[in-house]
Amino acid sequence: DTMVRQLHDGLFPNIGKGDKAAYNSIDAPMWFFWAVQEYDKALGEPGTVWKNYGSKMKSILTAFREGVNPGLRMDANGLIWARQPGKALTWMDAVVRGVPVTPRAGYAVEINALWYNAVCYMLKLAEEAKDNTFIKEWKDMPELIRTSFVETFWNEEPGYLADYVDEKGQNLDVRPNQVFACSLTYSPITDDMKERVLKVVTRELLTPKGLRTLSPKNPKYHGHYEGNQDERDNAYHQGTVWPWLIGAYIEANLKLYGKQFLPEAKEL
């Protein structure tokens, strides 16, 4: 609730507060829907969730659809495009000497997976609350987003999702961000696609401590997080293992394989 009070034009502050707050993270509003979703599951009272957070969640969807923030918008294909010069807008946000190390400008895979999940979840809540105005306004969006997501991110030959897509096309760096398209409650991809994605992630990114942020096969890979600030920032999301990612990896596998994956999940 503290963060909700700081919501502005569909964004939460990344760092700072008040006049010094930096609203430069496109991830946070998308994860807000996930957080409310998890709270809803635990509480078991969707009516309370809608009453407390429905209007705020609506305002986020509207802000992205209408493009109220420079460089952040929902395109005609239903996907979220994000680009601001000199800024890294996703969680891979290291910047060295004014240049994003992992820029990912354009359509980012996890942002659009989270966007699909958010829209689907909001429609579920709206149906339970009988908010027919919202339903009429958004009911066609899930199919549009799902179709566009697959057409934009899926690459059949290697069998995984592009990390991001811009004017130059798909960026096929093997990164963990695609895991969220497999782990979220509402997923825009098929089970067959999930299986293929998870095989690639398991083969190239899985470690006993978490998931690598980049495949060791990639020439940009940094196997050690060390050195001065610039050197560490250059490795921060270019190979460094992040433990928090293992949660989505386990969740994705449990959704796909059920109890069959439990022994492996316990080992992780």
Q: For the regions a protein language model found, what residue spans apply to each?
A:
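Catalytic cores of carbohydrate-active enzymes
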Residues: 13-14, 65, 69-76, 116-225
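A generic structural motif
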Residues: 107, 122, 129, 256-257
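Carbohydrate-binding/catalytic loop surfaces
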Residues: 12-31, 35, 73-104, 156-180, ...
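Aromatic-rich carbohydrate-recognition surfaces in CAZymes
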Residues: 1-89, 109-112, 116, 240-258, ...
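Secondary-structure junction/capping motif
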Residues: 52, 56, 104, 110, ...
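Aromatic (Trp/Tyr) and acidic
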Residues: 94-105, 170-207, 232-268
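Intrinsically disordered, low-complexity regulatory segments enriched
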Residues: 36-39, 96, 120, 143, ...
